[in-house]
Amino acid sequence: MSFIAAAAQYPIDRLPDWQAYRAKLTGWIERAADGGAALAVFPEYGAMELASLDPATMGDLGGSLASVSALVPRVDALHAELAALHGMHILAASAPCALADGRYVNRARLFTPAGAVGVQDKLIMTRFEREEWGISGSAPLRIFDTELGKIGINICYDSEFPLLARAQAEAGMELLLVPSCTEAEHGYWRVRHGAQARALEGQCYAVHAPTVGMAEWSPAVDLNRGAAGIYTPPDGPFPPSGLLVAGEMDAPQWLFGAIDLDHVAALRADGGVLNMRDWAEQPGGGSLPPVEVVDLR
């Protein structure tokens, strides 16, 4: 199976009203469709621009959590509409979502053209999220069985912990999505190196989509550095560098790349090396977190 994936280098804008957000998202999806994308990947915390719709709380960390979380059902309805309209799988920008017990989680949602929705919460919080922002990690870890293959999601920092993606790979994952939000180049490179390592270990693709640009009005996502990338194992039919395509640093844009899952199957069966098969031979390589397989076909 082969298709085009699009990874967003997405700017956090100050928006005057809901219609401005709707127009922005619709335009981005239309451009992805014009590029032939069957899968569009938005970044971590891209939804925080919705905090600007409430000027009274947009400058407050706690207040912005509540205001954005309240809009998530409306945001999700728009994504579902656009996924159906364009026949596209869309990973929405992650958003803070309130749980019944009062905690907030960082949640990514994967929409299919047929109307199915898969949810992956971030498991491991950064220092800012846990010490200043009050966002909690949340299990379970999942993969999603879709018409585009078996997809896993590691939100930003999660990609820096190899057992998560390894467990997803053993559950059948062929394509890892890595939405990110990093305020400095150090963070961007940590996530990029993590995503590339996960692609090498799991002999799979990794699609990395970051936020970019300045949003000085926001105390949460004021600085955003990064470049999108699609990473592969450095073996077989893939580039020697393991870098399929990379975007221009900090520039708002879509990055397009061709995904061929037949290459993943072939490499896992008969690659120059067999990282996927040989994982258990390393000392301590046996115990992995559980993974829930969700049918989105």
List the predicted regions and their residue ranges:
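CN hydrolase (nitrilase-like) catalytic-core segments centered on the catalytic cysteine
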Residues: 69-71, 75-90, 160-252
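Extreme N-terminal starter segment of soluble prokaryotic enzymes
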Residues: 1-7
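Active-site catalytic loop in hydrolytic enzyme cores
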Residues: 99-174, 184-197, 273, 283
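A short, polar/charged loop-to-alpha-helix boundary motif
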Residues: 122-135, 252-266
